[in-house]
């Protein structure tokens, strides 16, 4: 039993690439939950990027989730899965190197491995995970034309300069590579007011990035290949968009 547990915690632990059923994706969540308990609660592992620019907001708000006494509930979540399903809509997608921005609990890392990516880079402003580098999405320390795919899930809203962040994503993306961005589309003003109270400086109103026209300007020169706009939510709903660098 101890041997199995140690294997699950191993940084090089990999999943077979044919795991696409809901039950097998749930297995990923279980692994990440065990790793969180081990690295954060047992080993007290936590690192923080000190050189964050003023463009990034909500760091203290997000970091608080690790220290407010709540242990995260792990279950398959469409917020995590949908960006990858949009990415996989490209039948010619190369699966050599992928960059994941904002993988708080490692789920995206293991999903990327499960769907076949060979080299996975993960970046966040803070993390307990040895699989995640700390850094700033406005200043990516990677060479140009480096990644076959980029997943930016639910992090762009924490930027006061989304153009700079998107420019960096475009710069490090390879030709024929794809970048997927997921944001929360807010349709109720009261929800925006609540967010602005919790997160100082978050963009609201027409400045909030949540439409195709806005993203087309941010990723000028790239081709929009997929849009998922779930308009069912009365308060907010997922908006996921994919661009390809031709």
What are these regions (language model features)?
Residues 97-139:
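Class I SAM-dependent methyltransferase SAM/SAH-binding core
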Residues 180-216:
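Conserved class I S-adenosyl-L-methionine
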Residues 138-150:
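A short acidic, Gly/Pro-enriched loop at the edge of an enzyme's catalytic core
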Residues 163-178:
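A short glycine-rich, Lys/Arg-flanked "PGG" loop and its adjoining helix->strand segment in the class I
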Residues 23, 27-91:
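Class I SAM-dependent methyltransferase Rossmann-like catalytic core
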Residues 220-246:
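Core SAM-dependent methyltransferase catalytic element
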Residues 149-161:
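A short SAM/SAH-binding and catalytic strip from SAM-dependent methyltransferases
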Residues 93, 160, 174, 220:
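Short conserved AdoMet
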């Amino acid at each position: 039993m101890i041997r199995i547990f140690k294997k699950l915690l191993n940084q090089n632990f990999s999943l077979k690439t044919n795991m696409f059923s809901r039950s097998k994706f749930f297995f990923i969540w279980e692994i990440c939950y065990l790793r969180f308990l081990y690295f954060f609660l047992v080993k007290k592992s936590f690192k923080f990027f000190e050189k964050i620019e003023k463009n990034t907001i909500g760091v203290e708000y997000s970091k608080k989730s690790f220290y407010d006494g709540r242990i995260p509930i792990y279950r398959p979540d469409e917020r995590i899965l949908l960006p990858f399903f949009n990415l996989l809509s490209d039948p010619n997608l190369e699966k050599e190197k992928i960059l994941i921005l904002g993988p708080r609990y490692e789920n995206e890392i293991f999903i990327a491995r499960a769907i076949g990516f060979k080299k996975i880079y993960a970046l966040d402003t803070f993390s307990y995970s040895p699989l995640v580098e700390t850094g700033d999405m406005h200043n990516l320390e990677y060479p140009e034309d480096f990644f076959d795919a980029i997943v930016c899930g639910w992090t762009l809203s924490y930027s006061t300069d989304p153009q700079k962040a998107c420019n960096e994503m475009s710069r490090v993306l390879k030709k024929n590579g794809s970048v997927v961005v997921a944001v929360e589309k807010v349709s109720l003003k009261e929800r925006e007011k609540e967010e602005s109270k919790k997160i100082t400086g978050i963009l609201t109103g027409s400045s909030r990035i949540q439409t195709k026209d806005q993203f087309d300007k941010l990723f000028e020169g790239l081709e929009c290949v997929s849009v998922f706009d779930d308009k069912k939510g009365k308060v907010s709903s997922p908006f996921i968009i994919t661009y390809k660098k031709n």
